[in-house]
Amino acid sequence: WNPNSNSTKRPSLDLYYQRSLPHKQTLILNMVGTYIHTNANQMYQEWKNDILLSDILSNVDGDKYSIIGEGIYERQFEAGRLGGGLKHTQSWTDNTYSGTVGGRTKMKQSETYLYTEFSGRVKKLNYTAGIGVSRSWFKQEGEEDYQYYTFRPKVSLQYNFTDNMYFRVNGSVNNVSPSLSELSAIEQYIDTLQIRRGNPYLKPYKSYDMQANYLYKKGIFTGDLNFYYSNSPDRIMEEVIRENNKFIRITDNQKGWQKLSGDLTLRVGPIIKRIISLSVTGGVNRYISEGNSYSHTYNNWYYRASVMAMYKKFMAMFQIQSSYNTFVGE
Protein backbone atom coordinates (compact mmCIF):
# COMPACT_ATOMS: atom_id res chain seq x y z
CA TRP A 1 0.00 0.00 0.00
CA ASN A 2 1.70 3.23 -1.09
CA PRO A 3 -0.47 6.38 -1.16
CA ASN A 4 1.22 9.62 -2.18
CA SER A 5 0.14 13.23 -1.86
CA ASN A 6 1.90 16.29 -3.22
CA SER A 7 1.04 19.97 -3.27
CA THR A 8 2.93 22.90 -4.76
CA LYS A 9 2.40 26.66 -4.66
CA ARG A 10 4.38 28.71 -7.17
CA PRO A 11 3.70 32.46 -7.34
CA SER A 12 6.10 34.47 -9.51
CA LEU A 13 6.68 38.01 -10.76
CA ASP A 14 8.22 38.77 -14.16
CA LEU A 15 9.40 42.30 -15.03
CA TYR A 16 10.53 43.07 -18.58
CA TYR A 17 11.91 46.33 -20.00
CA GLN A 18 13.06 47.03 -23.57
CA ARG A 19 14.29 50.30 -25.01
CA SER A 20 15.47 51.23 -28.48
CA LEU A 21 18.47 53.58 -28.40
CA PRO A 22 20.05 55.77 -31.09
CA HIS A 23 22.43 54.26 -33.66
CA LYS A 24 20.48 51.00 -33.95
CA GLN A 25 21.03 49.98 -30.35
CA THR A 26 18.70 47.97 -28.09
CA LEU A 27 18.71 47.47 -24.32
CA ILE A 28 16.70 44.67 -22.67
CA LEU A 29 16.31 44.11 -18.91
CA ASN A 30 14.45 41.18 -17.40
CA MET A 31 13.95 40.11 -13.78
CA VAL A 32 11.95 37.14 -12.48
CA GLY A 33 11.25 36.42 -8.82
CA THR A 34 9.74 33.08 -7.80
CA TYR A 35 8.64 31.47 -4.55
CA ILE A 36 7.92 27.73 -4.44
CA HIS A 37 6.37 25.96 -1.47
CA THR A 38 6.25 22.17 -1.71
CA ASN A 39 4.72 19.59 0.59
CA ALA A 40 5.19 15.94 -0.33
CA ASN A 41 4.03 12.92 1.67
CA GLN A 42 4.67 9.24 1.10
CA MET A 43 3.53 6.34 3.26
CA TYR A 44 4.66 2.78 2.61
CA GLN A 45 3.36 -0.21 4.57
CA GLU A 46 3.83 -3.95 4.25
CA TRP A 47 1.30 -6.36 5.74
CA LYS A 48 1.18 -10.14 6.06
CA ASN A 49 -1.83 -11.94 7.51
CA ASP A 50 -3.08 -8.69 9.10
CA ILE A 51 0.31 -8.16 10.75
CA LEU A 52 2.09 -4.87 10.03
CA LEU A 53 5.65 -5.73 8.96
CA SER A 54 6.90 -2.26 8.04
CA ASP A 55 5.62 1.28 8.30
CA ILE A 56 7.59 4.00 6.51
CA LEU A 57 6.48 7.62 6.47
CA SER A 58 8.29 10.36 4.58
CA ASN A 59 7.33 14.04 4.58
CA VAL A 60 9.14 16.92 2.91
CA ASP A 61 8.12 20.51 3.57
CA GLY A 62 10.18 22.93 1.52
CA ASP A 63 10.51 26.58 0.57
CA LYS A 64 12.56 27.87 -2.34
CA TYR A 65 13.18 31.49 -3.30
CA SER A 66 14.87 32.42 -6.55
CA ILE A 67 15.75 35.59 -8.44
CA ILE A 68 16.82 35.60 -12.08
CA GLY A 69 18.11 38.84 -13.59
CA GLU A 70 19.39 39.39 -17.12
CA GLY A 71 20.58 42.39 -19.10
CA ILE A 72 21.09 42.24 -22.89
CA TYR A 73 22.67 44.85 -25.17
CA GLU A 74 22.57 44.71 -28.98
CA ARG A 75 23.86 46.99 -31.72
CA GLN A 76 23.35 46.66 -35.44
CA PHE A 77 26.24 47.43 -37.81
CA GLU A 78 26.48 47.21 -41.58
CA ALA A 79 28.63 44.11 -41.20
CA GLY A 80 26.32 42.40 -38.71
CA ARG A 81 24.91 42.46 -35.19
CA LEU A 82 26.90 42.63 -31.95
CA GLY A 83 25.27 41.48 -28.74
CA GLY A 84 26.21 40.73 -25.17
CA GLY A 85 24.66 40.18 -21.81
CA LEU A 86 24.90 39.23 -18.17
CA LYS A 87 22.59 36.72 -16.48
CA HIS A 88 22.55 35.92 -12.77
CA THR A 89 20.49 33.31 -10.93
CA GLN A 90 20.30 33.16 -7.12
CA SER A 91 18.41 30.49 -5.15
CA TRP A 92 17.74 29.85 -1.46
CA THR A 93 16.19 26.58 -0.26
CA ASP A 94 15.00 25.47 3.18
CA ASN A 95 13.70 21.88 3.41
CA THR A 96 12.43 20.08 6.51
CA TYR A 97 12.25 16.27 6.47
CA SER A 98 10.12 14.34 8.94
CA GLY A 99 8.69 10.86 9.38
CA THR A 100 10.84 7.75 9.63
CA VAL A 101 13.96 9.87 9.04
CA GLY A 102 14.13 13.55 9.98
CA GLY A 103 16.43 16.42 9.18
CA ARG A 104 16.73 19.90 7.77
CA THR A 105 18.81 21.37 4.96
CA LYS A 106 19.51 24.99 4.10
CA MET A 107 21.18 25.65 0.78
CA LYS A 108 22.26 28.57 -1.37
CA GLN A 109 23.12 28.37 -5.05
CA SER A 110 24.02 30.92 -7.70
CA GLU A 111 25.10 30.97 -11.33
CA THR A 112 26.46 33.94 -13.28
CA TYR A 113 26.86 33.96 -17.06
CA LEU A 114 28.66 36.70 -19.00
CA TYR A 115 28.60 36.41 -22.79
CA THR A 116 28.99 38.21 -26.11
CA GLU A 117 28.30 37.19 -29.72
CA PHE A 118 28.48 38.56 -33.25
CA SER A 119 26.22 37.62 -36.18
CA GLY A 120 26.92 38.47 -39.79
CA ARG A 121 26.76 37.34 -43.40
CA VAL A 122 29.40 36.80 -46.08
CA LYS A 123 27.79 36.17 -49.47
CA LYS A 124 25.79 32.94 -49.01
CA LEU A 125 27.15 32.19 -45.54
CA ASN A 126 25.34 33.29 -42.38
CA TYR A 127 27.37 32.96 -39.19
CA THR A 128 27.18 33.56 -35.45
CA ALA A 129 30.15 33.26 -33.09
CA GLY A 130 30.04 33.80 -29.36
CA ILE A 131 32.03 33.31 -26.18
CA GLY A 132 30.95 33.27 -22.58
CA VAL A 133 32.12 32.51 -19.05
CA SER A 134 29.91 31.07 -16.31
CA ARG A 135 30.50 30.86 -12.55
CA SER A 136 28.67 28.28 -10.43
CA TRP A 137 28.57 28.55 -6.61
CA PHE A 138 26.91 26.38 -3.98
CA LYS A 139 26.78 26.38 -0.17
CA GLN A 140 24.98 23.93 2.09
CA GLU A 141 24.74 24.64 5.81
CA GLY A 142 27.36 22.60 7.61
CA GLU A 143 29.34 21.85 4.43
CA GLU A 144 32.11 23.64 2.55
CA ASP A 145 31.11 25.80 -0.39
CA TYR A 146 32.43 25.42 -3.92
CA GLN A 147 32.71 27.51 -7.06
CA TYR A 148 33.54 26.57 -10.64
CA TYR A 149 34.26 28.59 -13.77
CA THR A 150 33.41 27.34 -17.27
CA PHE A 151 34.41 28.70 -20.68
CA ARG A 152 31.41 28.47 -23.03
CA PRO A 153 32.00 29.10 -26.75
CA LYS A 154 29.35 28.62 -29.43
CA VAL A 155 29.20 28.85 -33.21
CA SER A 156 26.48 28.64 -35.87
CA LEU A 157 27.02 28.44 -39.64
CA GLN A 158 24.41 28.30 -42.40
CA TYR A 159 25.29 28.09 -46.08
CA ASN A 160 22.46 28.83 -48.53
CA PHE A 161 23.17 26.99 -51.77
CA THR A 162 19.94 28.32 -53.31
CA ASP A 163 16.69 29.79 -52.03
CA ASN A 164 15.45 26.20 -51.65
CA MET A 165 18.50 24.46 -50.20
CA TYR A 166 20.76 25.12 -47.22
CA PHE A 167 23.09 23.38 -44.78
CA ARG A 168 23.33 24.51 -41.15
CA VAL A 169 25.55 23.42 -38.27
CA ASN A 170 25.49 24.58 -34.64
CA GLY A 171 27.94 23.85 -31.84
CA SER A 172 28.05 24.94 -28.21
CA VAL A 173 29.51 24.17 -24.80
CA ASN A 174 27.08 24.44 -21.89
CA ASN A 175 27.50 24.29 -18.13
CA VAL A 176 25.08 22.12 -16.12
CA SER A 177 24.90 22.56 -12.34
CA PRO A 178 23.44 19.98 -9.93
CA SER A 179 19.96 20.73 -8.61
CA LEU A 180 19.49 21.64 -4.97
CA SER A 181 17.47 18.45 -4.41
CA GLU A 182 20.36 16.33 -5.74
CA LEU A 183 22.81 18.11 -3.41
CA SER A 184 20.75 17.59 -0.26
CA ALA A 185 22.68 15.50 2.30
CA ILE A 186 19.55 13.63 3.45
CA GLU A 187 18.48 9.99 3.25
CA GLN A 188 14.86 9.14 2.43
CA TYR A 189 13.38 5.65 2.70
CA ILE A 190 11.45 4.61 -0.42
CA ASP A 191 10.44 1.19 0.91
CA THR A 192 11.97 -1.56 3.03
CA LEU A 193 14.71 -2.23 0.47
CA GLN A 194 15.40 1.14 -1.18
CA ILE A 195 16.86 4.39 0.16
CA ARG A 196 17.34 7.62 -1.80
CA ARG A 197 20.46 9.51 -0.71
CA GLY A 198 21.58 13.00 -1.71
CA ASN A 199 25.17 13.87 -2.58
CA PRO A 200 26.55 17.25 -1.44
CA TYR A 201 29.81 16.60 -3.34
CA LEU A 202 28.35 16.76 -6.84
CA LYS A 203 30.17 19.01 -9.28
CA PRO A 204 28.89 20.88 -12.35
CA TYR A 205 29.70 19.29 -15.69
CA LYS A 206 30.02 20.42 -19.30
CA SER A 207 27.78 19.39 -22.18
CA TYR A 208 29.25 19.52 -25.70
CA ASP A 209 26.42 19.76 -28.23
CA MET A 210 26.44 19.72 -32.03
CA GLN A 211 23.53 19.78 -34.48
CA ALA A 212 23.57 19.61 -38.29
CA ASN A 213 20.60 20.20 -40.59
CA TYR A 214 20.19 19.90 -44.37
CA LEU A 215 17.00 21.09 -46.07
CA TYR A 216 15.98 20.84 -49.72
CA LYS A 217 12.74 22.00 -51.35
CA LYS A 218 11.47 21.49 -54.87
CA GLY A 219 7.90 22.32 -55.74
CA ILE A 220 5.56 20.58 -53.33
CA PHE A 221 8.33 18.29 -51.99
CA THR A 222 10.56 19.03 -48.97
CA GLY A 223 13.32 16.90 -47.47
CA ASP A 224 14.73 17.71 -44.03
CA LEU A 225 17.71 15.73 -42.69
CA ASN A 226 18.90 16.25 -39.08
CA PHE A 227 21.80 14.94 -37.02
CA TYR A 228 22.44 15.63 -33.34
CA TYR A 229 25.32 14.69 -31.05
CA SER A 230 25.75 15.42 -27.34
CA ASN A 231 28.65 14.43 -25.10
CA SER A 232 28.63 15.04 -21.33
CA PRO A 233 31.75 13.82 -19.51
CA ASP A 234 31.29 13.54 -15.73
CA ARG A 235 27.52 13.82 -16.14
CA ILE A 236 25.43 13.65 -12.98
CA MET A 237 23.46 10.38 -13.17
CA GLU A 238 21.90 7.88 -10.81
CA GLU A 239 23.50 4.65 -9.68
CA VAL A 240 22.45 1.93 -7.25
CA ILE A 241 24.81 0.59 -4.59
CA ARG A 242 24.23 -1.99 -1.86
CA GLU A 243 24.81 -1.27 1.82
CA ASN A 244 23.66 -3.39 4.78
CA ASN A 245 21.22 -5.35 2.61
CA LYS A 246 19.69 -2.10 1.30
CA PHE A 247 19.73 -0.69 -2.24
CA ILE A 248 20.95 2.91 -2.06
CA ARG A 249 19.90 5.10 -4.99
CA ILE A 250 22.33 8.00 -5.29
CA THR A 251 23.46 10.48 -7.91
CA ASP A 252 27.13 10.99 -8.67
CA ASN A 253 29.42 12.41 -11.32
CA GLN A 254 29.66 9.35 -13.58
CA LYS A 255 32.18 8.72 -16.37
CA GLY A 256 30.02 10.20 -19.11
CA TRP A 257 26.92 10.14 -21.30
CA GLN A 258 26.49 10.43 -25.07
CA LYS A 259 23.54 10.73 -27.42
CA LEU A 260 23.58 10.33 -31.19
CA SER A 261 20.38 11.06 -33.05
CA GLY A 262 19.41 11.25 -36.70
CA ASP A 263 16.10 11.65 -38.52
CA LEU A 264 14.70 12.31 -41.98
CA THR A 265 11.45 14.17 -42.63
CA LEU A 266 9.66 14.11 -46.00
CA ARG A 267 6.81 16.54 -46.63
CA VAL A 268 4.44 16.76 -49.58
CA GLY A 269 1.91 19.50 -50.06
CA PRO A 270 -0.29 21.22 -50.44
CA ILE A 271 -1.95 18.79 -52.85
CA ILE A 272 -5.53 17.97 -53.95
CA LYS A 273 -6.66 21.53 -54.68
CA ARG A 274 -4.01 22.81 -52.23
CA ILE A 275 -5.90 21.39 -49.26
CA ILE A 276 -3.90 18.35 -48.08
CA SER A 277 -0.33 18.24 -46.69
CA LEU A 278 1.49 15.03 -45.73
CA SER A 279 4.54 14.57 -43.50
CA VAL A 280 6.51 11.44 -42.52
CA THR A 281 9.51 11.29 -40.16
CA GLY A 282 11.76 8.35 -39.29
CA GLY A 283 14.74 8.39 -36.96
CA VAL A 284 16.87 6.70 -34.33
CA ASN A 285 18.34 7.70 -30.96
CA ARG A 286 21.41 5.94 -29.59
CA TYR A 287 22.36 6.43 -25.95
CA ILE A 288 25.68 5.51 -24.32
CA SER A 289 25.62 5.71 -20.53
CA GLU A 290 28.99 5.12 -18.85
CA GLY A 291 28.79 4.97 -15.06
CA ASN A 292 31.45 4.43 -12.43
CA SER A 293 30.17 0.88 -11.95
CA TYR A 294 28.09 0.19 -15.09
CA SER A 295 28.00 0.60 -18.85
CA HIS A 296 24.77 0.59 -20.87
CA THR A 297 23.69 1.35 -24.44
CA TYR A 298 20.18 1.75 -25.79
CA ASN A 299 18.74 2.28 -29.28
CA ASN A 300 15.32 3.84 -29.85
CA TRP A 301 13.82 3.79 -33.35
CA TYR A 302 10.89 6.14 -33.78
CA TYR A 303 8.52 7.46 -36.42
CA ARG A 304 5.96 10.21 -36.81
CA ALA A 305 3.36 10.78 -39.55
CA SER A 306 0.73 13.46 -40.00
CA VAL A 307 -1.98 14.59 -42.40
CA MET A 308 -3.24 18.17 -42.37
CA ALA A 309 -6.17 19.64 -44.29
CA MET A 310 -6.83 23.37 -44.64
CA TYR A 311 -9.93 24.78 -46.32
CA LYS A 312 -10.84 28.45 -46.07
CA LYS A 313 -10.90 29.19 -42.30
CA PHE A 314 -10.99 25.54 -41.20
CA MET A 315 -8.11 23.22 -40.36
CA ALA A 316 -8.06 19.53 -39.38
CA MET A 317 -5.06 17.40 -38.48
CA PHE A 318 -4.31 13.75 -37.71
CA GLN A 319 -0.98 12.61 -36.26
CA ILE A 320 0.43 9.26 -35.14
CA GLN A 321 3.82 8.64 -33.58
CA SER A 322 5.78 5.99 -31.74
CA SER A 323 7.51 6.43 -28.39
CA TYR A 324 10.46 8.82 -28.30
CA ASN A 325 12.38 7.28 -25.41
CA THR A 326 15.35 8.64 -23.50
CA PHE A 327 17.94 6.77 -21.44
CA VAL A 328 20.10 8.29 -18.69
CA GLY A 329 22.03 6.55 -15.90
CA GLU A 330 21.22 2.95 -15.02
What are these regions (language model features)?
Residues 2-143, 160, 221-227, 258-286, ...:
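Face-selective signature of the C-terminal outer-membrane beta-barrel domain
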Residues 175-224, 231, 249-261, 269-271:
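Outer-membrane beta-barrel signature, preferentially recognizing the C-terminal barrel domain
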Residues 132-134, 172-176, 186-188, 230, ...:
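Active/binding-pocket-proximal capping segment
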Residues 229-231, 253-325:
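Gram-negative outer-membrane beta-barrel transporters
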Residues 117, 162, 166-169, 174, ...:
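A conserved cytosolic signaling coiled-coil/coupling helix that links sensory/transmembrane modules
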Residues 1-2, 39-50, 94-103, 139-148, ...:
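Outer-membrane beta-barrel translocator domains and adjoining extracellular loop/strand segments
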